[in-house]
């Protein structure tokens, strides 16, 4: 249904929002920035400063992983450069000049968050980290994630003359949706990120075991995929794909505490799962804090949302309302 509204558009949306808010109270989160995406209808169900540019640490690695899966074979042998071997902790300890199987590096990157694995993967596929970063940003752009700018494959903080390494909670949700469900390599991505333990033996006979740090896999029965992250700038971060009660959702939590608040992200994640599964209708409105002028045209074309019907994500990003700010 299409309706036309004039300058009272904000008041109209507020009225609708308040009536719907009564059904499901919004969660109070620790995260500075957060988003919850209804992945079946491409609608943001919850947002908190979700369009703010934020450092996102190792959650970057979900895009590194899917781009690697789409542009290489798991059997590829990856030769380690001096730069790859010299990456800071957390790292596997790759040896310069040695070659490792792509599959082993992907599991090391996604389960243990090893920075040297991510760097070696990037150099193997892109030729250089700079060119691989261009591949990441091109993929983000193809997904409509225009507020994402990645400079490193492992999420370590960096900046150039254009900007700093960042994304937004909204963009990160959309990236996870693509990784978990929409890519032709989503099945492989899910398999890697759902694995609790992975072991391999390198060519020197050293046995390695990787353990998955995504606690939501064991603390809930609905986690399809997830990735943690931390830097001193980004704080604790988390992105996940969730499927519960026939509903698919993606969540992103950025700036979710600093030491000693490592568990804040798990608390916030569970709150968003509860909120998302108890919300009967998906909805999206104008976010509080946006300037009135953004919606102050003499005539605006607005598509109303009804359950189980599609609405464009780009439209929803324009009309996103954080209801609790109106109380």
Question: What are these regions, as identified by a protein language model?
Answer:
Residues 2-25, 327:
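Sec-dependent N-terminal signal peptides of Gram-positive bacterial secreted proteins and lipoproteins
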Residues 145-146, 161-327:
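Domain-terminus/edge residues, biased toward the C-terminal soluble/receptor-binding domains
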Residues 20-184:
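Active-site-adjacent loops and short helices of periplasmic peptidoglycan-processing enzymes
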Residues 13, 47-49, 210:
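Short amphipathic beta-strand/extended segments with alternating polar/hydrophobic composition
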């Amino acid at each position: 249904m299409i309706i036309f509204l004039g300058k009272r558009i904000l008041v109209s949306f507020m009225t609708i929002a308040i009536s719907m808010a009564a059904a499901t109270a919004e969660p109070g989160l620790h995260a500075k920035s957060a988003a919850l995406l209804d992945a079946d209808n491409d609608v943001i169900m919850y947002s908190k400063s979700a369009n703010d540019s934020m450092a996102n640490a190792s959650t970057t690695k979900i895009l590194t992983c899917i781009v690697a899966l789409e542009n290489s074979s798991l059997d590829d042998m990856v030769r380690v450069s001096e730069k790859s071997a010299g990456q800071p902790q957390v790292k596997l300890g790759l040896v310069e000049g040695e070659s490792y199987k792509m599959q082993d590096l992907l599991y090391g990157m996604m389960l243990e968050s090893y920075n040297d694995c991510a760097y070696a993967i990037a150099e193997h596929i892109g030729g250089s980290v700079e060119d691989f970063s261009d591949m990441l940003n091109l993929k983000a752009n193809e997904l409509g994630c225009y507020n994402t700018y990645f400079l490193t494959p492992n999420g370590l903080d960096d900046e150039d003359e254009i900007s700093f390494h960042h994304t937004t909670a909204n963009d990160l949700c959309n990236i996870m949706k693509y990784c978990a469900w929409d890519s032709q390599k989503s099945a492989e991505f899910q398999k890697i990120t759902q694995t609790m333990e992975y072991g391999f033996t390198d060519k020197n006979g050293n046995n390695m075991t990787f353990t998955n740090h995504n606690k939501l896999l064991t603390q809930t029965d609905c986690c399809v995929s997830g990735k943690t992250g931390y830097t001193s700038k980004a704080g604790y971060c988390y992105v996940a794909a969730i499927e519960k009660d026939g509903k698919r959702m993606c969540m992103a939590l950025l700036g979710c505490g600093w030491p000693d608040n490592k568990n804040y992200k798990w608390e916030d994640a569970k709150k968003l799962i509860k909120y998302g599964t108890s919300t009967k209708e998906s909805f999206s409105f104008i976010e509080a804090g946006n300037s009135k002028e953004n919606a102050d045209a003499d005539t605006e074309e607005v598509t109303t949302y009804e359950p189980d019907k599609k609405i464009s994500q780009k439209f929803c990003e324009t009309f996103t309302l954080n209801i609790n700010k109106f109380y």
